């Protein structure tokens, strides 16, 4: 029953324990940092303009500056916010697809917010000190499944291939 010729469940996958890819540990400020950040990049207006929805959890008195650069290094978005969620629009984006995987660089500047002087409310003077920068790669695309077909940016995609498990 359990000889070499019998079917073994998950025979196409070598189950290893431990870390299988490169891993990094980052030291961050305990009192002022980003605990979690997520973003969803999509397309609108006939796939011409991009949207980026950002949701974050921070601790401490933190403000975040978002800077989005295209491949050529041009700044296409610069915004600062202390809100937990933000939605930004980027005009005339390059679409990401399998043939042209165009990626933008999103830099998330974590800034400590400090009130300076005796002013209160809107009259208070605030200083921002950057305590860290977190980089991300962002691709603007819409992916959907319609029936049994996969669509990327309004174009049907035909997949060929088989399982692939990365084992060195």
Question: What are the functions of these language-model segments?
Answer:
Residues 1-168:
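Secreted/periplasmic carbohydrate-active enzymes, especially glycoside hydrolases
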């Amino acid at each position: 029953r359990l000889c070499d010729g019998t079917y073994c469940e998950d025979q196409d996958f070598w189950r290893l324990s431990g870390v299988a890819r490169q891993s990094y540990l980052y030291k961050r400020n305990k009192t002022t940092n980003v605990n979690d950040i997520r973003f969803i990049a999509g397309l609108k207006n006939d796939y011409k303009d991009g949207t980026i929805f950002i949701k974050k959890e921070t601790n401490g008195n933190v403000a975040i500056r978002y800077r989005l650069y295209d491949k050529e290094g041009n700044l296409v978005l610069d915004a600062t916010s202390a809100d937990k969620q933000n939605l930004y629009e980027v005009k005339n984006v390059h679409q990401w697809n399998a043939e042209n995987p165009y990626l933008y660089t999103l830099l998330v500047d974590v800034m400590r917010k400090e009130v300076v002087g005796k002013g209160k409310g809107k009259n208070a003077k605030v200083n921002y000190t950057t305590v860290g920068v977190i980089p991300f790669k962002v691709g603007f695309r819409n992916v959907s499944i319609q029936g049994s077909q996969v669509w990327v940016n309004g174009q049907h995609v035909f997949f060929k291939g088989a399982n692939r498990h990365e084992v060195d």
